[in-house]
């Protein structure tokens, strides 16, 4: 047998042995995740902005499962608080952040002042800033969550948080406040009223 064939067989046997060991270890030492943490994490907006005081949505979900307040997520707003309250079986709380008076904002980079240091790119938790080293950076407006984590690291202060223009696309439609009436029920109610008058 040639040495190349022996080497290939030896590598295949070693790969099979190590694969079996890894397969056994993954079954034997499997760590079960808490299903409530997964459910909470699915409700959170996944912006990873850190405004709640945790480094991301998953650590905040774990903290909520361990009894932390459900009202610390500004990007999620009151709707997320209500969903979390429903899931956890508690009363919805007011947001820990003043959501009503806070105007939604997005980052804006004054490109004539940008030196391309990439510090804002590294700070952005949602990858809403694009640009290369020593090149002008810009913000993808639709991706920006307005967390303002990119403002502090900028050495030239070229990043500004500007209010989001309200358009029909960005307006928060309060469709739940509009009463929905089933037409067939309304028609039968009207017929019953007409019959009772006769």
UniProtKB/Swiss-Prot annotation:
[4Fe-4S] cluster 3 binds at residues 124, 144, 147, 150. InterPro entries: 4Fe-4S_dom (IPR007202), 4Fe4S_Fe-S-bd (IPR017896), 4Fe4S_Fe_S_CS (IPR017900), Elect_transpt_cplx_RnfB/RsxB (IPR010207), RnfB/RsxB_Proteobac (IPR016463), RnfB_subfamily (IPR050294). Its main location: membrane. It is found in: Cell inner membrane. One of its GO terms (molecular function) is 4 iron, 4 sulfur cluster binding. Its cofactor is [4Fe-4S] cluster. Gene3D superfamilies: 3.30.70.20, Electron transport complex subunit B, putative Fe-S cluster (1.10.15.40). Keywords: 4Fe-4S, Cell inner membrane, Cell membrane, Electron transport, Iron, Iron-sulfur, Membrane, Metal-binding, Repeat, Translocase, Transport. [4Fe-4S] cluster 2 binds at residues 114, 117, 120, 154. Residues 105-134, 135-164 form the 4Fe-4S ferredoxin-type domain. This is Ion-translocating oxidoreductase complex subunit B. It comes from Vibrio parahaemolyticus serotype O3:K6 (strain RIMD 2210633).
